[in-house]
C-alpha cells in the first residue's frame, strides 16, 4: 500500500486491485485536484457517516462532484453497447465450473449466490438456514466472485477518507451502483438459489455459458424483462440512472479499462403472486465479508 503521508488525497479510484482474481490492473486515474485534506486529529473528532453519499457530501463535496461527472459519462457510455464490449469470460453457472459452488437438492440444481443489501436486523430479516420467499426482482453474483474482489482490494493509504468508506465506494462502482443517499448497503447475503429460477439479464438469458449476445437498442418487446431493466436504467421518474449495458456483467465505473467489466450478474424475477424460494446460508457485514483471513 502506498504511503502518501500528508499529500492531497489522490483519488478514491486510484488503487491497485486484482480483477476477477486473475492479474493486476493498471492504476485508475487520480482526482488529486478535487479533494480536501482531513488529518487524523480532525478525523478522530468527526462523526463519520456510514454512507458513501453522506460522507462525500459532508467532507469531500468536490470529490463527490467529480465522481458524479464520471458516473454520468459512464451512464452515457453504457447506454449504447458496442460489439467490442461483448466478452467471452462470464462466470457460467454449471457443475462443470470449478469456481462456483453448487449442490443438488431434492433433485434440483442449486447455486450459491450473493447479493449486497441493506439489512437492519439480520437474525430476523435473513435467518440462517431458513427458507425464504422472495417476491421481488433480486440481483446476484455467483459466490465467490465479489468476495474475492473485495478481499484483494487495497485501500489508498490516505488521511482524507476512512478505509471503510473507500471500500463501500469501490464496491458500488464494481457492482454498477450509483451514488445516492438511499444506496447504503450493509451486508452480503449468500443463499442457495434454484437453477430454474435464475437468468442472466441479457438478450439471451442462459446462465450456463460464458457470453451474452450484443444487446439491441431499442430492446425488442419479445424480451420484456430485459426491456424493463433497460428502460428503468435510463428513463425513470426519479431521474436516477444506472450504467447498464445488458452484456452479462456489471458496468464497473471505477475501472478505467474498457469494457469496464465487473462481475457476472444474474437475477431472479418473481412476483408477489409467484415468489421464489431460497435458502439463506450467511448474512455477513460488508467489512467482515471483505476481510482476507488467510488460513495458516
Feature map (PLM): residue ranges:
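Short active-site loop/helix that positions an aromatic residue
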Residues: 144-168
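Boundary at the C-terminal end of the N-terminal hydrophobic targeting segment
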Residues: 26-29
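Solvent-exposed loop/turn segments at secondary-structure junctions
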Residues: 118, 145-148, 196-199
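Conserved NAD+-utilizing ADP-ribose enzyme module
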Residues: 172-296
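Short His-Asn-centered micro-motif
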Residues: 140-144, 192-194
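Bacterial N-terminal signal peptides
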Residues: 11-21
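ADP-ribose/NAD+-binding catalytic cleft of ART/PARP-like enzymes
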Residues: 31-141
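Bacterial N-terminal signal peptides that target proteins for export
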Residues: 2-11
